[in-house]
């Protein structure tokens, strides 16, 4: 098989309040869809909680400690997110094609995941719109970039030793991408 993921668009700002990321994942659409919608699988790369359903509520439980295979300290800057639960609304649900839900209980816009088959792989396009914070592009871009990297590793059957180290590298990469 090819690499676990190809970063086709690291992150780009498509509007003042919108960022877009694109990845080519080494897994079929059916598998990627399950990792987006099933709480137990989503917990392995992003946030657990309830399963996503059409026109449903979506509880996201953020347990970033579970994303690292090594025991690593939780950065002070993100301590307020440890164990956080957010209650989101699924606003678009097209099985194996599109999942969109509010973010930050609606205060931080909408995250939309689009899936496109590419042979035995999946092209995932993530668009986060309605970002209100002036630093939101960097904050959400680095968060999504690091979480998508974890997803790619999980799909390849691998673990991530230190999520927070990955997040720090993602933040640097995203900052450079959004400058240009």
Describe each model-derived feature in a short phrase:
Residues 1-51:
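Hydrophobic ligand-binding cavity/cleft-lining segments
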Residues 51, 64-131:
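Hydrophobic-ligand binding "helix-grip"
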Residues 46-47, 101, 135-136:
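Short helix-to-loop capping/linker segments positioned immediately adjacent to catalytic or ligand/cofactor-binding
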Residues 32, 42, 58, 90, ...:
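Hydrophobic pocket/interface hotspot
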Residues 16, 27, 55, 94-96, ...:
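Residue-level signal for tight coil/turn positions that link beta-strands
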Residues 2-8, 12, 77-81, 119-180:
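Terminal "cap-and-tail" regions of soluble proteins that handle hydrophobic small molecules
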Residues 20, 39-83, 163-170:
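Short beta-edge strand/loop motif at the mouth of beta-sheet-based domains
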